[in-house]
């Protein structure tokens, strides 16, 4: 009986160890498998990412096609965690289910237009009255209400809203108040304005955190600068969107960045062609003036002659884990068909491991982590694609089986020897009769 119990116990221990290993590496294995599957669906000139609110069942997919000279995007509000299928034989106007197709037009002026992701059923309109003043050129992109549950407070997430107002920051404040008044956004959302002189790029999200200790209180109130305690922000901002029958023409950018002590570590990467003095523009807006020095301005056409090694490496310190991270500005650029494009890149998150995007083919896997305030936030981590090989999984399973058999054989042999020895000792035992005294 003891022999059977011992073997069962050992097998249970082995099963526990095996299952623990597989559980720890399950996301990697599945990520590799997913990457392999997606590779057959999406060519290498695609970026696939998502905005998620609360869970994988509430995501807005962005499937960005890097196609010269056009950039195309396919977005869908979907109710399952499966990847949407893409038919490469069809054009960029391909639609399936709830797919909405956006087609890029020529870049429009940076100021004077407003684009809003309409999550609350706000009626589409070309104008919006703010403080008794009508602002035109407003486009609302309607998204199914199922995309966000009725109780926004129960689902964490970050929503992107890009404002391009020629009037400046003060009018952005009016717009936010108007949107709250019309229940387009919740009263508890927060927003970030980089600098007073900077127009646009206003990020909408949830759960305002305390202002970083390095902010002066009056400065924080003046610039409305909040921090997520060094965690990753990201927003998807659309500029110059115009309704055109069933299609929407656009010029867009995607940003993913982190904030430390009020310093914007990563300028918003622009997915369209760099046709302006990118770094100089951001430095003059106060992004990196003190920390990074004065960069030489350049345009997209002459980036091939730029010595990226001359740019300093930006470092930032994470208080909670007592570590310093850094990145180089050259990581922002990806050379595609002889031209440089500035791509979305992953900053870092200590809870999700450090990751970077360096212009390689990359795909995604779903991640969930908990904020310091215990609010869950889910999103798709963008990661370099990894070749998936079925034989690695087979080898892993075979190795575990072989190890289990070896342990079983060793235990079986030792137990058998022990029983044999016990029998021999029992045979050598002589009965000594009890003497009556």
Question: Residue ranges of each PLM-predicted region?
Answer:
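Cleavable N-terminal signal peptides of Sec/SRP-targeted secreted and luminal proteins
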Residues: 4-20
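Aspartyl protease catalytic domain
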Residues: 20-43, 129-249, 336-348
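Aspartic protease catalytic domain
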Residues: 20-23, 27, 141-146, 196, ...
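Signature of the N-terminal lobe/flap region of pepsin-like aspartyl proteases
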Residues: 42-146, 284-296
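Short conserved beta-strand and strand-loop elements enriched in small hydrophobics
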Residues: 50-53, 124-133, 192, 241-243, ...
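Short hydrophobic beta-strand that contains or immediately precedes a catalytic carboxylate
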Residues: 51-53, 60-65, 71-73, 158-159, ...
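A residue-level signal for conserved active-site and pocket-lining positions in enzyme catalytic cores
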Residues: 65, 128, 159-160, 196, ...
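Extracytoplasmic, non-cytosolic globular domains
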Residues: 253-287, 291-294
């Amino acid at each position: 009986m003891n022999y059977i119990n011992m073997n069962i116990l050992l097998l249970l221990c082995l099963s526990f160890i095996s299952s623990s290993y597989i559980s720890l590496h399950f996301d990697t294995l599945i990520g590799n498998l997913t990457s392999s599957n997606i590779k057959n669906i999406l060519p290498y000139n695609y970026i696939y990412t998502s905005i998620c609110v609360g869970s994988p069942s509430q995501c807005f997919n962005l499937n960005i096609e890097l196609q010269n000279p056009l950039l195309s995007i396919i977005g869908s509000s979907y109710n399952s965690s499966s990847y949407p299928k893409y038919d490469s034989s069809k054009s960029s106007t391909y639609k399936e289910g709830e797919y909405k197709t956006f087609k890029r037009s020529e870049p429009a002026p940076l100021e004077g237009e407003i684009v809003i992701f309409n999550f609350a059923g706000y009626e589409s309109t070309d104008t919006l009255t703010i403080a008794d003043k009508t602002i035109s050129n407003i486009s609302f992109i309607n998204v199914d209400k199922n995309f966000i549950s009725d109780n926004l407070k129960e689902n964490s997430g970050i929503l992107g809203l890009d404002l391009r107002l020629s009037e400046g920051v003060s009018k952005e404040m009016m717009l936010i108040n108007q949107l709250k008044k019309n229940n387009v956004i919740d009263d508890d959302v927060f927003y970030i304005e980089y600098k007073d002189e900077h127009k646009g790029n206003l990020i909408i999200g949830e759960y305002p955190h305390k202002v970083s200790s390095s902010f002066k209180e009056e400065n924080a109130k003046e610039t409305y600068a909040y921090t997520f305690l060094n965690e990753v922000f990201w927003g998807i901002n659309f500029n110059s969107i115009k309704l055109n029958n069933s299609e929407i023409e656009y010029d867009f950018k995607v940003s993913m960045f982190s904030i430390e002590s009020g310093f914007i570590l990563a300028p918003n990467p622009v997915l369209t062609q760099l046709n302006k003095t990118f770094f100089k523009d951001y430095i003059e807006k106060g992004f990196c003036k003190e920390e990074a020095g004065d960069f030489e301005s350049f345009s997209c056409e002459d980036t091939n002659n730029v010595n990226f090694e001359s740019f300093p490496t930006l470092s930032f310190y994470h208080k909670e884990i007592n570590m310093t991270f850094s990145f180089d500005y050259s990581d922002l650029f990806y050379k595609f068909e002889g031209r440089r494009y500035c791509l979305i890149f992953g900053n870092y998150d200590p809870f999700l491991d450090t990751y970077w995007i360096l212009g390689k083919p990359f795909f995604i896997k779903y991640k969930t982590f908990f904020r310091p305030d215990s609010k869950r936030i889910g999103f798709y981590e963008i990661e370099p694609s990894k070749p998936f090989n079925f034989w690695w999984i087979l080898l892993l399973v075979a190795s575990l089986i072989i190890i289990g058999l070896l342990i079983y054989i060793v235990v079986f042999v030792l137990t058998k020897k022990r029983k044999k020895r016990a029998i021999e000792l029992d045979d050598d035992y002589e009965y000594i009769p009890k003497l009556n005294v």
